C-alpha cells in the first residue's frame, strides 16, 4: 500500500537539505507489506468508485492519505448526523452539531507537524514532461518503480476524455497540447501504439491526427517535442539566451517579466540555445511516424512554426509578435549561431542562463518555483553535467512533487501546505469551540511559525532579478522560499489572532520583529494603483502582454495587482494596526486606503469582482467584501459593498447555494454551473462575503437557505462531498485543491453560527 510520510528527509542523502528540518515536507512511499486485506480492499473500492463517478465529478476525493490518517488517529464520528426536514428551520443545536462534526473530522486529518496534507493538482501537462526528462536521462525506471509507473498510467487513463484526448485540466475539453504529451507519456511508460485501457493510445492518436498532427501543438509542446527529437528546433519560435545579456533597463528583458514566466523561459532559453535533442531511440523514431501526417523529412518547419490547433489557441498572436519571431528566426538566429558570434556571444549567454538556473535552484532547495520549471531546470543541469551535484540535488527533491490518490499518481504544482493550513486555522478559530480545537490550534500555530521565510535570497539578489523574501510565507513550506503576498497576509493574520490567546493553550506567540518583517514585505508589494501584487513589485508595463508566447495562457508577461491579494493584505494590516499601533502607522493607514480604492476600482458593472486564483467571480467577491468590511466599509456607507451584495443575492440558486463554472475564468463573465447546480465551497464563499457585508442584520433568509444546504450535504463521517474544481491560474488552467471542501463549508458554518444566532435563539 501507499503511505504518506510527513517531515521526512533522508539522513543518508548528501544531496537533500532543508532550512527547517523538512517541516511541511510530504512524500509518498509504497510498502508492499503494508495494510490488511480489508484496507487494501477499501483502496480498490475507492478507485472503482472514482471511475464510476468520474462522468459527474472529475476531481478525486484524495482518499488514500485520509484513510491512512483516520486510521492512525483512531477516528470515530460520535456526533449523530444532523437531519433537517423540508420546511423546517435551522436551530442553534443543528448548526453547532454540524460544525462539531466537521471540526472533529477535519482535526483528525491534521499531520504530526501541524499542517493538513492535500493534493494541489488537476493540470494535465505537469506529469508528462517529468517522464520525458527521465526517459532522456535514463532515470525513468531508476526513479519510478513498477508501482509508480502503474499509478501514473492509472492517472492518465482516468482523465482521458471520451473523444480520446486530454484537456488542459481535468474538467477541460481536449486540446492538442495535453493530448500529445499524455500520448507520448503512455508510450514511454510501456504502452503500445494501440495499447492502453479502452484503446487509450489508439483513440488519442486518432484525435491528434484528426486535428492536424503534432505540428499543430502550441509553443510549449513544440519545445518539448524538439527536445525529444519528435519535432525540429527550426519549427519553434526563437528563445535566444542572449536575452540575459541585454541591459536590465531594456523593456523586454526577462528580468522584468512575471516570475513564473521568467523561471520557465530561463531554462527554455538554455535548451534552445544548445539546440539540445535527446537520444533518437527506436521509440522516438516510431513516434515521428505515429504523430505526423507526412514523412518527418518532408515537413516545412518554418510553416509549422506558426501552426496552433484552434482548441489550444486562447491567446492569438498579434501581428507585432509574429514580426518579432520572424525577425529573430530569419535574421538574428543565423548570425548568433555562426562563427564568430557563436563563440563570443552564444556561449557566454548560455553560461549566464545557467548561472541563473543554479541560483534559483539553490535558493529554493531545488524545489524551484513550480513543477514546470523544476523539470526544465533539472534537464538543463543534466545536460551541463550528467554526473554533477546539481542534477543529483534535483533528483532528491522529486518526491516532493509526487502525489497518490484514488485516481493514480500525479505531479503537483509543488504543494499548498501553508495556504491550506492558514485557512484551516482561521476556520477553526471562528468556530469558538476551544475545548475541541486547542491541540489542533497549537500544532497549526507551530507549523505556521516554523514555515516563515527568515532570510532574503542569497547574495546580490537584486542582480538576479529577485525581491526580498524575509518575513514572508510561501504557498507550501519554508524550503520553497518564494514569497507570496496573500499567503503572507493570511499567515500573519493567524499569528496575530493566536497571539491574543493564552500561550499555554496555543503556544508562544511569534516574535514581533518577525511580524514587522512580514509587514515590510507586504508594503513593498503595493503597486501604483493601490493593489497588491502576488510575488514581486510590478516591473513591466502591461503592454508586454503583446509578446505573450504561450498560446494558451493570458496575463503571464507582467506582474500585476490582484483583488484577492489586496483584500488579504488589508485584513492583515488592519489587525496589525490594532495590535501594534506605533509601527509604521502612517504608511499602514495609507496602504489600507489605497487598497480599498483599488478594490472599489476593480468592481465590474454587475457588482462582482473577477478572481485570479479561484473560480471566479464568487471567489473574488468574497475576498473583496471581506477586505472592504475589514477597512470599515459597510452596506450603508459603501456603494461597492451594496453592489457586491446585490450580485451575490442575484445569483443564488433555488436550493440555497451558489455554483459557478470554471468557464467564467477564460470567458471573463459569470457563468453558472451546468443545470444551475450548487457547489458547497462556492456556497461557503458567498455566505462569508454576505456575512461580512452585514446580511444577517438585514435579511438572514439567504444565509439560512445556504446553511441548510451545507448542513444537509454533510456526509456521515463529518466530511463533505467532493464536487467541481475550484482553483485557477493564468485564467485558463484550473487547479484541484482537494481540502477546500472541508475548510470552507466548516468556516462558513462557523461564521453563520455567530451571525445568525447572536443570542442563541433558534429560527
UniProtKB/Swiss-Prot annotation:
Cellular component terms (Gene Ontology) = lipid droplet
* Keywords assigned: Isomerase, Repeat
The catalytic site is made up of 486 (proton donor)
Cell membrane in keyword set = no
Q: Which GO terms describe its molecular function?
A: beta-amyrin synthase activity; lupeol synthase activity
- Listed transmembrane segments: none
Q: Which residues form a coiled coil?
A: none
Top-rank taxon: Eukaryota
Q: Which reaction does it catalyse?
A: (S)-2,3-epoxysqualene = beta-amyrin; (S)-2,3-epoxysqualene = alpha-amyrin; (S)-2,3-epoxysqualene = lupeol
Report the EC number(s), separated by commas if there are several: 5.4.99.39, 5.4.99.40, 5.4.99.41
The PFTB repeats are found at 149-190, 592-632, 641-682
A Pfam cross-reference name: SQHop_cyclase_C
Q: Name one GO biological process term.
A: triterpenoid biosynthetic process
Q: Entry's Gene3D superfamilies?
A: 1.50.10.20
The function of this protein is: Multifunctional enzyme that converts oxidosqualene to nine different triterpenes, mainly lupeol, beta-amyrin and alpha-amyrin in a 15:50:30 ratio.
- Family the entry assigns: Belongs to the terpene cyclase/mutase family.
Per its record, how is this protein called by name? Amyrin synthase LUP2
Q: Which organism is it from?
A: Arabidopsis thaliana (Mouse-ear cress)
